[in-house]
């Protein structure tokens, strides 16, 4: 997992071709003006998804894991908490192969705050939760 500011995003060029495609896409435009839904980048190399999330408490959210790709998240407005598991994911239902998505429970995790100007990059195979409500912050 990488947690940093969007200003530092270019520092991560060269980690993977797919990540490079996302970084170049994000840095070349005002991401606040992207349309809702999915935007494909460079064919099927990467996808940018813009969506509205209603934060939920951590105990109501399952961890998710994507085995074949990285996931980069940022908040265009507001803030949310995220968690990254330090242990293995125990699936609660079969993997959705088409979406490269496995959901389930996991042990000990670390938490962080995602807000405007920051990003979290979840590595392939890394269980994480996002869109979590920060206690007392209204988001």
Where are these regions (language model features)?
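Short, surface-exposed secondary-structure edge patches
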Residues: 72, 110-112
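A short glycine-rich, His/Asp/Glu-containing loop-to-beta-strand
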Residues: 36-57, 67-76, 83-84
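Surface/interface-facing alpha-helical segments and adjacent flexible terminal/loop regions used
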Residues: 1-45
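A short local loop/turn or secondary-structure capping micro-motif enriched for an aromatic residue
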Residues: 57-58, 90-93, 130
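Short acidic (Asp/Glu) patches
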Residues: 51-67, 95-108
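Short, compositionally biased
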Residues: 133-139
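Conserved metal-binding segment of the jelly-roll/cupin
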Residues: 104-105, 112-133
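Short, conserved beta-strand element in jelly-roll/cupin
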Residues: 67-80, 86-88, 95-104
